[in-house]
Amino acid sequence: MNDIKSGEKKRLYLYDNLKFLLIVLVVLGHLIDDSTVKLFGDGGGETGVPQAKVFSGAFVFLYAFHMPLFLFISGLFNRGHDDGRKVLGKTLGFVVIGMLMKCLNYWSQVRFQTDFDRENSDGEIFFDLLGGDGVYWYMFAMAAFMGLCYLLRNSRPWAVLTTALAAGYDPSVGDEYELSRIVVFFPFYYCGYVLDPEKVAEFVKKWYMRVLSLGVIGIWAYFCFEKTKLVYPLRMLLTGRNSYFSISEATDMDCTFLSRLLVMGISALLCLAVLGIGLDVKIPLITKCGSRTLQVYFWHRTIVYMLTYYGYQAYLAKAFPERWELYLALTAIPIVLVLCIKIFGVPLDMVLKGIRGRNDIIKENGNGK
């Protein structure tokens, strides 16, 4: 979700346009999360807001590719992993933003806690410095990915995939330090890191890629919305948070590394398909917003908490009983457009510029080599 820096080269609008689509889907995923019908496993169930089975299918559909593709695109453009000083600066930037986001998330949960949550929660909301399952995981994961690429710059790619598959056997690899998602999603970032963005863009522009992409997306949509019970067990794998044992215990699926490999294969295929339908042209408003996704991601969860607190989902279900699901889904678009306004990016720019400035001082003093 970081801005693309293309230097003197022509900017590849394909990725900005895709980032706009993906951030809309990220916001959509969090808007509908509480409205998914619980089939089995984690997620869904009684949450105090109206629910619809279509959102259970939509959740699986979205989570199969939206974060993997975001991380792949981030890997494409986060260069400079061979320069330890640059890596340190970028890593610190994401850690600081992640901590700020964790504080914002905690405040939002406390301030906008609904009566249902208050009555049905296991206890008070507490601030977890090292763990938690909030959206801030992405910031800490990005910091870890940059550091890992620096450490593994001379390693073979197969080692990255092997580690991701093996991690599921360790039940201690979970939300603590965001370890599970860091390990599970790193291969997608790493693939972007080792590939060239221009060559990727050139490949997906081929006419047959458009046709194949539409076919792949259509088939996945069919399974998600028409055969929801068949693919819904994959939900716990798609979030990247759960061990194989916990998934097997919560579902009828005998989860192993092959299950993870299957899901990663589905995600990789869908990422390629979504890349294949992207447009490499400058689209008014959309392309600009696609370059500001970091600020949208930082603030959007607070907006979702606020809408739930004030009964937005319940209002839609009552006022538009036949179409409330559609209107709830469309709400993601204005949220993204509003949060793309430049003022929402000012705090993040101040943090990143401050860290870059500090890094330059270290370099001038001869300590950043």
Annotated model-derived regions:
Residues 1-369:
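Alpha-helical transmembrane segments and their immediate juxtamembrane cytosolic regions
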